[in-house]
Regions:
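Ligand-binding cleft/hinge of the Venus flytrap
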Residues: 56-66, 159-175, 194, 210-214, ...
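Short, glycine-/small- and polar/acidic-enriched structural segments
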Residues: 34-168, 179, 218
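C-terminal motif of bacterial Sec signal peptides marking the signal peptidase cleavage site
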Residues: 23-25
């Protein structure tokens, strides 16, 4: 059974979020085939690539199936997930918060949260990495030693990915000059010399504009030894190396390897099977109608669904869909079953754990002890081929973050 949050806290969080009825109007009451006609999906803010992709899908499904879908936006992970957990939203396209909420880690290790029973519904891939100006003299990650490196404000998950990138080059945070900057402020900071590198989606208006003004280079993260990827599993378990082309600053035919991961559509585990089955079937059926509407929407194709690293379970209706498409495997089922067992044991242990730790003055202490408890008491998850170490996966670029 999925855990429920403190109702007052969740309703307050949900009430503070804008619901954009203009994306797809609500005319209400009846149900479309396979589930609810009126749906709310939470996601990133208006103007982000993530929002634009989801709006394209929502509008297409409204026009083709009669589903009335509204998008609810938030700039924070908790703001995107709280409406999903309390039932205000039925689906959410999230950042890495889906993983941390499933595990009950970081800010989700709290009275209001704890581990959540979330499921993957659709997982389009995306590519992200660090870039530099070509006139910087920086050609590899190792060349970042002594340079000004961004420490993103209020972006713990991305900072962990950037630490993993440094580790790939044999560096740590002590080998660079850390500069506090917001995610959106990185491009201007690079232009003015406040930082020497930045972390970014490989496509998007902002990075394309930067590349048109200053020739840029994506630092390659491919072809490494297992040792170079040794910390990726702990720091960024949802990430693997992925080759991309057609990214900002790349010449025709040029490719590079950076981090590949999904900004997925997720639902609660108890979302009705028939509804999810109908939804994913329609996302596949009407893919030709929305695939060219944004620069990234083509990555929503069923043949491009990202399957690894698998860090939370797929919804059972999506597993059936992937089986029909010939994309499911014995290794994936083994991993899926292990994640379901991990979820069961976390949910079983959480109430007693929190009772013993809720009064600690420093919330970070409880967070660390929860991670330590899991390491000591839960079996290691089985690996799936094609994840780490060293094996790259090829994809065209996709969107994700703002």
């Amino acid at each position: 059974m999925p855990r429920t949050l403190n109702r007052r806290a969740l309703l307050a969080a949900a009430a503070s979020l804008p619901v954009l009825a203009g994306v797809a109007g609500c005319s209400g009451g009846s149900t479309a085939a396979g589930g609810t006609q009126q749906l709310v999906w939470s996601t990133f803010g208006v103007g982000t690539g993530t929002y634009n992709d989801l709006a394209a899908v929502a509008n297409t499904l409204t026009q083709k199936t009669g589903r009335q879908i509204r998008l609810m936006t938030s700039d924070t992970g908790i703001g995107r997930l709280a409406p999903l957990i309390n039932g205000t939203a039925q689906y959410s396209r999230t950042g890495d918060e889906y993983y941390y909420a499933f595990e009950g880690n970081d800010e989700y290790c709290s009275e209001q949260w704890g581990p959540q029973a979330l499921r993957l519904v659709w997982t389009p891939p995306g590519n992200y990495g660090v870039l530099v100006r070509k006139d910087s003299g920086i050609e590899t990650v190792a060349d970042l030693k002594g340079r000004k490196f961004p420490k993103l404000i209020a972006s713990t998950s991305i900072n962990r990915k950037m630490e993993a990138i440094l580790n790939y080059g044999g560096l740590t945070g002590k080998d660079v000059q850390m500069v506090d900057v917001t995610y959106s402020g990185q491009i201007e900071a690079l232009k003015t010399g406040q930082i020497d590198t930045l972390y970014q989606n490989v496509v998007g208006a902002n990075v394309s504009e930067l590349a048109s003004q200053y020739p840029i280079r994506w630092l390659d993260l491919g072809g490494g030894t297992p040792a170079q990827y040794a910390t990726w599993k702990e720091l960024a378990p949802m990430v693997k190396p992925g080759e991309f082309s057609k990214g900002a600053g790349l010449a025709k035919g040029e490719t590079a390897v950076n981090m590949q991961y999904t900004i997925p559509v997720v639902a609660r585990a108890d979302r009705p099977h028939e509804e999810v089955a109908s939804l994913v079937a329609d996302m596949d059926r009407y893919y030709p109608d929305y695939k060219d509407t944004t620069p990234d929407a083509h990555r929503f194709g069923a043949d491009q669904i990202q399957l690894t690293p698998l860090v939370i379970p797929f919804h059972d209706a999506m597993v059936e869909f992937l089986e029909r498409k010939g994309r499911w495997s014995k290794d994936l089922q083994t991993r899926q079953d292990a994640l379901l067992e991990r979820e069961r044991r976390m949910h079983e242990a959480w109430p007693a754990f929190w009772q013993d730790h809720k009064d600690q003055e420093d919330p970070k202490s409880a967070r660390k002890e929860w991670v330590d408890w899991k390491k000591a008491n839960l079996p290691e998850l089985p690996e799936t081929p094609g994840t780490l170490p060293g094996a790259s996966s090829t994809t065209a670029p996709s969107g994700g973050h703002a």
